[in-house]
Amino acid sequence: MNKQNNYSDDSIQVLEGLEAVRKRPGMYIGSTDKRGLHHLVYEIVDNSVDEVLNGYGNEIDVTINKDGSISIEDNGRGMPTGIHKSGKPTVEVIFTVLHAGGKFGQGGYKTSGGLHGVGASVVNALSEWLEVEIHRDGNIYHQSFKNGGSPSSGLVKKGKTKKTGTKVTFKPDDTIFKASTSFNFDVLSERLQESAFLLKNLKITLNDLRSGKERQEHYHYEEGIKEFVSYVNEGKEVLHDVATFSGEANGIEVDVAFQYNDQYSESILSFVNNVRTKDGGTHEVGFKTAMTRVFNDYARRINELKTKDKNLDGNDIREGLTAVVSVRIPEELLQFEGQTKSKLGTSEARSAVDSVVADKLPFYLEEKGQLSKSLVKKAIKAQQAREAARKAREDARSGKKNKRKDTLLSGKLTPAQSKNTEKNELYLVEGDSAGGSAKLGRDRKFQAILPLRGKVINTEKARLEDIFKNEEINTIIHTIGAGVGTDFKIEDSNYNRVIIMTDADTDGAHIQVLLLTFFFKYMKPLVQAGRVFIALPPLYKLEKGKGKTKRVEYAWTDEELNKLQKELGKGFTLQRYKGLGEMNPEQLWETTMNPETRTLIRVQVEDEVRSSKRVTTLMGDKVQPRREWIEKHVEFGMQEDQSILDNSEVQVLENDQFDEEEI
């Protein structure tokens, strides 16, 4: 990496003030829920990663302190400690002025993932207090801030040092983050581990010093993204060792690693300057284009594709592919589409990645002849399966559509009266008896009921062609009406919310997992948009008195049950619901379907890698990883009258508020 750029006081540019951050924090960190809270940490970590990315330092330590504050320390050059050209100490400018950072105008960095300095000021604005300690030029400097960014001390020289680097410690402001200011070790772990995978020489340590939560993890991967791909494919049956390519074109550094497994879906993770581009972009397009072209050329060369045969589609070639595409782009070329950094727009990145892959992949295919031939045959089978699936989809959308759809849905779907797709809800209900109660108890205007009678297929282990043959899944696809797989278009959905409602037992939980697996793999935008929910029917009904003095209460947890038992005193009757069918329509409406009183869990995908690995663990072919996960996470010996919601990680929110449960 180029080290000629001078990271000094004059390289920090000031663009605008910081006044609006506390008034509208969502504009700067996305939200003030747990995502926004953890985003604060990433802003500071990204600054440290930028140092490593540009060749300065190789260690980052993140520590959750006993008091709930968090420290991020690196061994980079240390922030500039002189006087800025604006007349203020540079450290104060970095932490109190928005858009004051080393990125702007390429003052201090050749490549940068974050907006260096921007993050620091936003974090300061949203903190109860913040302290920075700098080791630079043989001296230790310290400055502190409080109450959302006001300096509580000047930049003070504390002593001598032989080290270099920056340490930032802050405590999030609980008047901004009202839900919680408690950091989640596992959430931080995923992001930090990702950074370590992407930079071979980077060592990251994550510590938790909180009482009862003491824990430490180290992340250092000498083989970089090669190990990243292996990590993503854990628990899957892989077809070969991880392949890696590196190169440079147009001043852009390109690193690619890939490995095929025996599954039917692809997983491509792309990064720009160590920042995940969740929506892909030009670098991902370059990778896919080159893969498709090279594989087709190879297939024709070995005569698996004849002259009359049409080319293999990229989707067929990528079936079962796991890949990581990482590019490093100079600041002057870096462009993103839209307001977020989730999609790369740099046109040069497409040709750079295409060039590197097109240069290296043919040699790999020739060298691994037997494997390459089997991958081509795998793609041809995928093409045949896709054609079969396409015909099934055309059946659903062609002239036969209405007749077949009516046949599929007759006697099953009880539709909503309204055609307002922005308000309508679809309840997927376990069993006929509960479906009957739900039909009678629902609000006919906007709630549709689809009872699930047969077996739902495990879509983790099935091709799309076979999924179409499963009556329950096929009915769900027709009912939602937005397509499936790569053809799924969320804007065509007939429903704003899809709510899974099952019994609170192991069979019900299994149906939930099967449905969530399907939605995650084949209707992912629906999950990503937060439009898939799990209904939480109560576990207990308590009744006391008669006539006008009669009192009926419901409990969703054992804790609520104990509280109500004490409140009601002696003489009440207790019913434990073992199934939805035990509730009459009025009770089902009141407890589980009425937006004013019901409790729902919103299913969210916070980290795609972690979610995908969890689905593979729970729903894949390998028994041992599933057994290990269950032994670690499930507490056995639960009595019949105990609640599955005893898990302290699940927070129940009422009155149509949503607990965000990650799959």
Curated annotation (Swiss-Prot):
Q: Which GO terms describe its molecular function?
A: ATP binding; DNA binding; DNA negative supercoiling activity; metal ion binding
Which residues are listed for Mg(2+) 1 binding in this entry? 430, 503
Cofactor info, note text: Binds two Mg(2+) per subunit. The magnesium ions form salt bridges with both the protein and the DNA. Can also accept other divalent metal cations, such as Mn(2+) or Ca(2+).
Q: Name one Pfam family in it.
A: DNA_gyraseB
Q: Please give the superkingdom of this protein's source.
A: Bacteria
Q: Which UniProt keywords apply?
A: ATP-binding, DNA-binding, Isomerase, Magnesium, Metal-binding, Nucleotide-binding, Topoisomerase
The record lists ATP as bound by: 7, 47, 74, 114-120, 341
Q: Does the keyword DNA-binding apply?
A: yes
Q: Where does Mg(2+) 2 bind?
A: 503, 505
- Ranges where the record places region Disordered: 386-416
Q: Which GO terms describe its biological process?
A: chromosome segregation; DNA topological change
Which prosthetic group or cofactor does it need?
Answer: Mg(2+); Mn(2+); Ca(2+)
Q: Does the keyword Transmembrane apply?
A: no
Q: Where is this site: Interaction with DNA?
A: 455, 458, 510, 626
Recorded hits in PANTHER family, A to Z, give:
DNA GYRASE/TOPOISOMERASE SUBUNIT B, DNA TOPOISOMERASE 4 SUBUNIT B
User: What function does the entry list?
Assistant: Topoisomerase IV is essential for chromosome segregation. It relaxes supercoiled DNA. Performs the decatenation events required during the replication of a circular DNA molecule.
**Which family does the entry's similarity section mention?**
Belongs to the type II topoisomerase family. ParE type 2 subfamily.
How it assembles, according to the record, is: Heterotetramer composed of ParC and ParE.
Per its record, how is this protein called by name? DNA topoisomerase 4 subunit B
**What species was this sequence derived from?**
Staphylococcus aureus (strain NCTC 8325 / PS 47)
| Classification of source organism | Bacteria, Bacillati, Bacillota, Bacilli, Bacillales
